[in-house]
């Protein structure tokens, strides 16, 4: 069997552009958030997406206990917020850097996100170092901004919606 080494895999994955998201939760275990690009649609019946979370991450116990989350897809210009949630900054400072609403699940919903998916975690599958969180979508909130944000080749890139 041919096994691909970790660096080759990471280099190859940098060729796959992905939306930049801040994943948030709030509940009995507290409030937490992190930046993620490992997010994708699973099915539209019922509306479900998945989020991958490293079990070694400091936020893992909070998400594991709360069992709710909000996927906040960032707009162009929100790179500093992505960096803040992707680092070692204390949670209270992360959340103080933006305006939030409370979603139907009680999770923080970023007011200026391109789109927010408010979810309950319906299933968890462990693979290697990560848990794959299957998330049943309970509510969606869209913002009118025409600019998206993607992570490609280890850097941010702005996308603009085509004119109709």
Curated annotation (Swiss-Prot):
InterPro entries: Flavin_Rdtase-like_dom, NADH-dep_flavin_reductase, RutF, Split_barrel_FMN-bd. It comes from the Bacteria. GO terms for biological process: nitrogen utilization; uracil catabolic process. Induction: Up-regulated by the nitrogen regulatory protein C (NtrC also called GlnG) and repressed by RutR. It is an enzyme of class 1 (oxidoreductase). GO terms for molecular function: FMN binding; FMN reductase (NADH) activity; FMN reductase [NAD(P)H] activity; riboflavin reductase (NADPH) activity. It catalyses: FMNH2 + NAD(+) = FMN + NADH + 2 H(+). Pfam families: Flavin_Reduct. Its EC number is 1.5.1.42. Keywords: Flavoprotein, FMN, NAD, Oxidoreductase. PANTHER family: FLAVIN REDUCTASE, FMN REDUCTASE (NADH) RUTF. Belongs to the non-flavoprotein flavin reductase family. RutF subfamily. Catalyzes the reduction of FMN to FMNH2 which is used to reduce pyrimidine by RutA via the Rut pathway. This is FMN reductase (NADH) RutF. It comes from Escherichia coli O45:K1 (strain S88 / ExPEC).
């Amino acid at each position: 069997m041919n096994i691909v080494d970790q660096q080759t895999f990471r280099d190859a994955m940098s060729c796959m552009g992905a939306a930049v998201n801040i994943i948030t939760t709030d509940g009995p275990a507290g409030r937490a958030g992190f930046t993620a690009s490992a997010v994708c649609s699973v099915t539209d019946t019922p509306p479900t997406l998945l989020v991958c979370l490293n079990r070694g991450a400091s936020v893992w116990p909070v998400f594991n206990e709360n069992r709710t989350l909000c996927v906040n897809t960032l707009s162009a210009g929100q790179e500093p917020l992505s960096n803040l949630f992707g680092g070692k900054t204390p949670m209270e400072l992360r959340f103080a850097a933006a305006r939030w609403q409370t979603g139907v699940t009680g999770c923080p919903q970023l007011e200026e996100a391109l789109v927010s998916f408010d979810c309950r975690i319906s299933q968890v599958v462990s693979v290697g170092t990560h848990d794959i969180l299957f998330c049943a979508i309970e509510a969606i909130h869209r913002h009118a901004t025409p600019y998206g944000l993607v992570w490609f080749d280890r850097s941010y890139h702005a996308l603009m919606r085509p004119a109709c």
